[in-house]
């Protein structure tokens, strides 16, 4: 909602998610109905961003995905291998990040990004039209000797607009440059700092939980010696 309000009349508004923009699928768990409710709200929020022309992206630091590696494996497969692809992994252990950021001969130079690819997943049917999921890899390092490859997830409405894609690319690099030798979007870094819970806040939450547990007739055990020692140190954040 804040992004939508800010976007009115603004030249470009970009929102970042720490991690994939695909909501993790918990359908096989007993909380499937809860997940479905969250998914509907999430898709509605994404639709709101799309309708208000707002750029959004998920930033994955040090990704371990091997989606492109899997495509390479398909090119190596024989007709016999194709009959049992789940067991055909000649490049097992190789990640997309290694391919794009291999130190001696990285495919991506400082500040460069890959082509945009479509994302196939079990939940792709939920992300239709402008919400369909895509991704690209980007080298956020400014040092040729030390590539830093990240994956960026984006929806179709960003993919289809070259200007949005370029603005996002530039914004990611600008944010990562702020962090110097450890490139990472500064906005996400600040969000992590702000989200830290102080010792006092943690104790307040603990008290609320204990009161609710007592109200329901539950028993509250003593703190472990380890936790008591931690609390006695007066730590200010967790």
Description of each model-found segment:
Residues 1-12, 19-29, 33-238:
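Long, contiguous domain-sized segments
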């Amino acid at each position: 909602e804040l992004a939508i309000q800010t976007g009115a009349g603004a030249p470009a508004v970009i929102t970042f998610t720490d991690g994939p923009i695909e909501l993790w699928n918990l359908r096989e768990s007993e909380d499937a109905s809860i997940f479905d409710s969250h998914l509907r709200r999430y898709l509605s929020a994404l639709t709101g961003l799309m309708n208000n022309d707002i750029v959004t992206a998920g930033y994955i630091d040090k990704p371990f995905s091997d989606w492109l590696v899997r495509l390479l494996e398909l090119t190596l497969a024989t007709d016999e291998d194709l009959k049992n692809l789940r067991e055909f992994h000649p490049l097992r252990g190789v990640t997309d990040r290694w391919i794009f950021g291999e130190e001696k001969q990285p495919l991506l130079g400082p500040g460069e990004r890959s082509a945009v690819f479509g994302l196939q997943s079990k939940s792709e049917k939920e992300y239709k039209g402008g919400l369909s999921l895509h991704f690209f890899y980007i080298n956020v390092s400014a040092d040729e000797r030390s590539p830093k490859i990240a994956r960026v997830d984006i929806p179709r409405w960003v993919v289809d607009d070259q200007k949005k894609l370029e603005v996002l690319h530039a914004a990611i690099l600008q944010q990562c440059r702020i962090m110097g030798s450890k490139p990472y979007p500064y906005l996400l870094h600040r969000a992590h700092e702000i989200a830290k819970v102080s010792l006092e806040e943690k104790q307040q939450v603990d008290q609320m939980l204990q009161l609710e547990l007592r109200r329901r007739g539950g028993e509250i055990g003593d703190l472990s010696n380890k936790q008591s020692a931690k609390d006695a140190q007066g730590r200010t954040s967790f």
